[in-house]
UniProtKB/Swiss-Prot annotation:
Residues 362-375 have a biased composition (Acidic residues). Its main location: nucleus. This is Protein downstream neighbor of son homolog. It comes from Xenopus tropicalis. It is found in: Nucleus. The gene is donson. GO terms for biological process: cell division; DNA damage checkpoint signaling; DNA replication; mitotic DNA replication checkpoint signaling; mitotic G2 DNA damage checkpoint signaling; replication fork processing. Replisome component that maintains genome stability by protecting stalled or damaged replication forks. After the induction of replication stress, required for the stabilization of stalled replication forks, the efficient activation of the intra-S-phase and G/2M cell-cycle checkpoints and the maintenance of genome stability. The lineage of its organism: Eukaryota, Metazoa, Chordata, Craniata, Vertebrata. Belongs to the DONSON family.
Length: 577
């Protein structure tokens, strides 16, 4: 064929001849420029992911020869190359210093680097040795978003969630908390009833010999409950139907007995609210089989009025509250952008009419109906309103309520009631039949009332405490590890009181794991942007320690989370939520 076609040359079948000429050319130019001759490995160094034409020094290493017909652009920016670049830095053979020295393509304000342009194999071989290919460096790591304090604080934020279990661990023994004497137990109960504030020393050398410490420990375990049935678990109430199966409940099928129990419960509930209103009770919980309500006195959680937080809720419950005239807000639900824009425009025009918190006034309903009419007015203008089937009012209502239904039984469904509306909520809960289960293991059982102070019809109960000593393995052998377990309905004041005692008894060093009742974690949602005006001066007779009142008066900081871990080291706290 070469004889028939003089211009035809089969040189493409011999790439070694081309490379030999290229190397000869490189040597000649290198001798002129005073640089080292070309080495086959330079191509792969300048173009990552490009295999050499000949094995060269890599011969015998099992490296496959590069396809000479491969597209260089696909080779440089191939998916395989991109995956190789995304490998963590620790897996790259390139030193960390060299990678850090190169300009990062993720730095703000710097132009994005352009990949080198190669039009042929010669351009790759004879390209500018100073040209650096596109190297993807690691993007700067974002700061950690964990809810953790900057190393150490003299106190920790208030946690309004109910706890079911606390586990304290320390290198110091907890034996002082075991086997309280009868006199110490009685003294602790009296101190609780009289709201005696105990001031312990900074550090106690012999905790087991400190009668004052042991009495204060008994005082911190006391709480009040209604109703009280020793054979029935009254907390938690959500999700415990399986544990209550088979329990004797004579009221479940006796309506007259149910009426007596509910009437006594209503009196106890009203008594608690009156104490709260008089600031003789700081807060209390109402635990039903579907939701939990936290009532707080004015001056707590950064609010200067009485507040009530309810979670979780459903659309049906919220609608029933609206029908009763209860004004409430949903702090974790973002306002509709269109409504927010209308409100901002109204405010800019000088409309200072206060907006009701429930967002469902009569004017809103009228505007919604007018919007529906306007949305179908264009059909009448075209004269086809009779030919096109319009959605009925029920479909429109369901479409609008679709977003509300999505919130049911979720933390975002939390409801906040303020001021005098809390009294309306009280009457609503007393008269609402749905707060008592009609069937199942909890049928006929009224909601559980939990309070840090005594009230009408309440029963005094104490949390259960148990200390355990274990051996933990360390490098040199075994080390004694001491733990203290607290179980029961643990309220915020008990958590703070116990940490104050352990701070002195354990010489400023311990760690704790908290187990929260999940539906109540959302009670830590901030409800007021500013600190309360009425603080501890008006709550000095509420039955809590002054430092506990000071902590509970602070604005909520945990959001919809709760404390999971608390550590005290050298009398300074760190925590995680």
């Amino acid at each position: 064929m070469a004889e028939l076609l003089p211009g035809y040359s089969p040189s493409f079948k011999k790439p070694s001849e081309i490379l030999r000429l290229s190397r000869r050319r490189s040597r000649s130019e290198a001798s002129k420029a005073g640089v080292s001759p070309f080495s086959p490995g330079d191509v792969t160094k300048r173009v990552p992911g490009l295999r050499p034409f000949s094995p060269g020094p890599n011969k015998g290493a099992g490296v496959k020869r590069r396809n000479p017909f491969a597209n260089l652009e696909n080779t440089v920016c191939s998916p395989v190359k991109r995956r190789a670049e995304s490998v963590p830095e620790c897996a790259s053979p390139e030193p960390r210093a060299l990678v850090a020295a190169r300009p990062s393509c993720w730095e703000l304000g710097s132009p994005s680097p352009q990949p080198p342009q190669f039009n042929s194999v010669e351009d790759v071989i004879w390209g500018d040795p100073l040209a650096d290919p596109l190297v993807k460096t690691e993007s700067p790591e974002k700061p950690a978003t964990a809810c953790e304090t900057p190393k150490g604080s003299v106190t920790f934020p208030a946690d309004w969630s109910l706890k079911t279990r606390l586990l304290f661990t320390s290198s110091q023994s907890f034996s002082w908390a075991d086997h309280l004497k009868a006199q110490e137990e009685a003294q602790g109960l009296v101190m609780h009833c009289r709201a005696t504030a105990v001031s312990l020393p900074h550090s106690i050398q012999e905790p087991k010999l400190s009668t004052e410490l042991r009495c204060a420990f008994q005082q911190s375990l006391v709480h009040w409950v209604h109703p009280s049935f020793p054979w029935v678990q009254l907390f938690p109430r959500i999700g415990i139907d399986r544990k209550m199966v088979g329990k004797n409940s004579p009221w479940s099928h006796d309506e007259s007995l149910q009426q007596v129990i509910m009437s006594e419960w209503a009196l106890s509930f009203t008594s608690l609210y009156n104490l709260l209103k008089a600031k003789l009770c700081p807060y209390f919980y109402v635990c039903t089989y579907q939701f939990t309500v936290l009532f707080r006195a004015a001056g707590l959680a950064g609010s200067d009025v009485i507040t009530a937080v309810m979670s979780p809720t459903t659309r049906g419950l919220r609608e029933a509250m609206k029908n009763e005239g209860i004004t409430f807000t949903q702090p974790l639900v973002e306002e509709d952008p269109s409504k927010k824009q209308k409100n901002s425009e109204a405010n800019s025009q000088g409309d200072i009419t206060p907006k009701k918190e429930n967002g469902n006034t009569e004017t809103d309903e009228v505007s919604d109906e007018s919007d529906e009419d306007e949305s179908f007015s264009w059909l009448e203008e075209m004269g086809v309103e009779d030919k096109i089937k319009k959605p009925d009012s029920i479909s429109i209502k369901l479409r609008k309520e679709k977003n509300e239904v999505k919130l049911d039984h979720k933390p975002e469904s939390v409801v906040l009631v303020k001021g005098t509306n809390t009294f309306t909520l009280l009457n609503f809960l007393i008269n609402c039949k749905s707060i008592v289960a009609a069937a199942g293991p909890q049928a006929g059982l009224p909601p559980t009332l939990l309070s840090p102070v005594a009230f009408r019809g309440a029963t005094m109960q104490t949390l259960k405490a148990r200390s355990v000593n274990v051996k933990t393995q360390v490098r040199s052998g075994y080390k004694d590890q001491f733990s203290l377990e607290i179980t029961g309905p643990i309220m915020p004041h008990s958590l703070h009181s116990l940490t104050m005692l352990l701070q002195s008894a354990q010489r400023g060093s311990f760690s704790a794991g908290f187990y929260s009742h999940d539906p109540t974690a959302v009670f830590n949602t901030p409800i007021h942007p500013q600190a309360a005006k009425e603080i501890s001066a008006d709550l000095q007779n509420c039955g809590l320690h002054p430092s506990t009142v000071e902590q509970l008066s602070q604005v909520n900081q945990l959001g919809k989370l709760s404390l999971r871990h608390l550590e005290l080291s050298d009398y300074r706290y760190t925590w995680k939520s």
